[in-house]
Amino acid sequence: MAKKIQSYIKLQVAAGMANPSPPIGPALGQKGVNIMEFCKLFNKTTENVEKGLPIPVIVTVYSDRSFTFITKTPPASVLLKKAAGIKSGSSKPKIETTGKITKLQIEEIAKTKKNDMTGLNIESMMRSIEGTAKSMGLIVED
């Protein structure tokens, strides 16, 4: 018989840097999950990812306090900031620009995110990521 799911916990954790401090500790502790076990498994899973990159993770907690988790790709905004070499997006996107990004870089980001963006082809994903770039004040060049 399958285990009964108690709850889902959505977190964003820096790759390779999971530790029991907030927000991880309290979120998992409330559900009775072994926090250190999660931290060790998460850090091992994300050891091939650039350290410090925020990784969305969905933790499934079962009624017997066991858990499984799924890691996603970093948010598009983080990948765009990294590709453009900027610290943050513009506070006034239509008025101020923060940097430039090429279509080739957007295509690379789309290919990175293809597993998380279901039901879309590469062109659709590129348009979506272009929209995110524009809302951050980035200029998209050909």
Swiss-Prot record:
One or more lysine residues are methylated. GO terms for cellular component: cytosolic large ribosomal subunit. Part of the ribosomal stalk of the 50S ribosomal subunit. Interacts with L10 and the large rRNA to form the base of the stalk. L10 forms an elongated spine to which L12 dimers bind in a sequential fashion forming a multimeric L10(L12)X complex. It comes from the Bacteria. The gene is rplK. Disulfide bonds: none annotated. This is Large ribosomal subunit protein uL11. It holds the Pfam family Ribosomal_L11. Forms part of the ribosomal stalk which helps the ribosome interact with GTP-bound translation factors. Keywords: Methylation, Ribonucleoprotein, Ribosomal protein, RNA-binding, rRNA-binding. One of its GO terms (biological process) is translation. Gene3D superfamilies: Ribosomal protein L11, C-terminal domain, Ribosomal protein L11/L12, N-terminal domain. Belongs to the universal ribosomal protein uL11 family. GO terms for molecular function: large ribosomal subunit rRNA binding; structural constituent of ribosome. It comes from Buchnera aphidicola subsp. Schizaphis graminum (strain Sg).
